[in-house]
Amino acid sequence: MRVRANASVPQPARTQYLAGLDIVSLGSERGERGLSYTPCLEKTAPECFMVRQHVTAIYDYKDFIFASIRREFEVTYLNSALGAIWTIIHPLALITIYAVVFSKIMQARLPAFDGPYAYSVYLCTGILLWTLFSEIALKAQVVFIEQANLLKKVNFPRLCLPIVVVGNGLIRFGIIAAIFAGFLALTGLLPGLVALALLPIIALTAWFAIALGLWLGILNVFFRDVGHFFSVVLQFWFWLTPIVYPASVLPDRAQELIAFNPLATLVMAAQTVVLQQTWPDWRALAWVLAIAVVLSAMTVRLYLRRGPEMQDEL
């Protein structure tokens, strides 16, 4: 049996991942094989079994996930004359503005760095990583609510949606990072082999973001104030992270407190790699990894316990 999203229902352009897409054709021809997704709703089942069932279901729907990522990317630039070229124009304009304003007009300088573009590079590095985190976390904490109609009409693993959020966030980040790398090459600040350290930093940032965003997203289904509260928290969180300012300008006590900010650890690690072109403090990143693991475990446990009730609240 072939299952299709109801095309007669109005669908918002940016939030409807499956508009016009055939669920069965995206699921590795699951329809032809007679397979279907059956969520485990038995709360008394062992949690390890339930986790394994969800992982297997997500793998079976990998084609659906890839198609949804592609669909979201296409919808973003639907009816645009320049289309996907805007993915280059926006970050290029951002980096150019930062470079010109802070390096030429304001002539901002970074302590311990003499280069004219040092502060611009410092700022861009922090903002790029922060944007990756905030985009994934913000979208993940509303993804179930935004896709409520889809979840009610089509039977598929709900956890596919957060994976789509991460995929789209990483694609956009990759485009911006490539342009930023070009800027670093032009200014002679492109790091060498040490740049490989950015890969685990980026991966850890995305992991922490989706773990936090999904945890908040589940809570947001039951308590809608969670999303609004998190948006406010992010504004304070940005300024509590050394992105616009270097941590060295803060009093010693403030620097000690910032060390407990996982985003500060990630941002400063990336800035160390890009500006100082040295390996980051892996021990500092290890505790961020520990936080991500614990937060992921909390999120999985919350989803297994409250997931079956989400359908009634959406």
Locate predicted features.
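Short alpha-helix boundary/capping segments
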Residues: 1-16
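Hydrophobic transmembrane alpha-helices and immediately adjacent juxtamembrane helices
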Residues: 17-27, 31-314
